[in-house]
Regions:
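Short conserved micro-motifs at the rims of enzyme active sites and ligand-binding pockets
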Residues: 27, 194, 216-220
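A short coil-to-beta-strand element that immediately follows conserved catalytic motifs
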Residues: 87-99
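Catalytic core of non-heme Fe(II) oxygenases with the double-stranded beta-helix
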Residues: 101-180, 201, 205, 215-223
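Short beta-strand segments enriched in hydrophobic/aromatic residues
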Residues: 127, 187, 209-211
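Short beta-strand His + acidic residue motifs that chelate non-heme Fe in jelly-roll/DSBH
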Residues: 111-114, 189-197
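Long, compositionally biased interface segments
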Residues: 213-235
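Short, proline-centered helix/strand-breaking motifs
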Residues: 182-186
Length: 235
């Protein structure tokens, strides 16, 4: 008997190392005070632990002249992801729309599940990862191989014989210092502590990238974003 198996529609996460990481790490620490923020704040008497600086009004690390070369490297790796890995045409300009700090200073400082709904590709560049740092975790939202709710997701008892890429409902990466992780912005993700024995500061620069058609393109695609050159802003 002949059987055929087609594993279709994978989701691709791209991990690379940033060349000259120490140089860029040192450069960031020189400007770190400009982007620092209160890790713990209080609102209506309730304590809030802020694991990112995204909502502090300063998500513009990519505009810092001292870090221009770093972000050029990130864009270069993103082009590899788009053109060489995903095999799309070279028809886009890439725009970093915002960038911010992701930071944990205690084992229980986790970032909850979320996605970056306003961009196409998101990145996380790991400046510092002490031993037992939090992992970056992704969710298989469509989860069609789950067959029915709970078969591969139950926290009490699931039906998975051995977890693999075909039946997994989640996947995590233990980022190394100096690594760059690129992934589709629409992917649900979070950070998760896998050890109580965590000390120090897990620190990353996180950002969003939007693809727009090249300025000199034909503009004959019905989907996607036209280059900002052709937009008009109303206030």
């Amino acid at each position: 008997m002949t059987r055929h198996i087609f594993n279709i529609f994978p989701t691709t996460i791209y991990v690379s190392e940033i060349f000259n990481h120490k140089k860029y790490k040192d450069a960031f620490y020189k400007v770190y005070p400009k982007y620092d923020y209160e890790q713990v704040t209080y609102e209506d008497g309730e304590e809030w632990v802020n694991t990112t600086s995204e909502n502090t009004g300063n998500p513009f690390i990519h505009l810092d002249d001292e870090l221009e070369e770093l972000f050029e490297n990130i864009i270069s790796e993103t082009k590899v992801y788009i053109h060489e890995v995903l095999n799309y045409q070279d028809i886009f300009d890439l725009i970093i729309t915002k960038s911010w700090i992701s930071r944990s200073r205690a084992a229980d400082e986790n970032i909850p599940w979320h996605k970056h709904s306003t961009s196409h590709i998101s990145f996380s560049y790991y400046l510092n990862t002490p031993p037992n740092s939090h992992v970056l975790k992704f969710a298989n939202i469509s989860n069609l191989n789950g067959l029915f709710d709970g078969l591969n997701t139950s926290d009490i008892k699931d039906g998975v014989r051995e977890s693999n890429e075909l039946n997994a409902s989640t996947f995590h990466i233990n980022p190394e210092e100096g690594s760059l992780i690129l992934f589709p912005s629409a992917m649900e993700h979070c950070t998760e502590s896998h050890s109580d024995d965590f000390k120090g500061e897990r620190l990353a620069i996180v950002g969003d990238i939007t693809l727009v058609y090249k300025e000199n393109g034909d503009n004959d695609y019905s989907m996607g974003f036209i280059n900002p050159k052709y937009r008009r802003t109303y206030k």
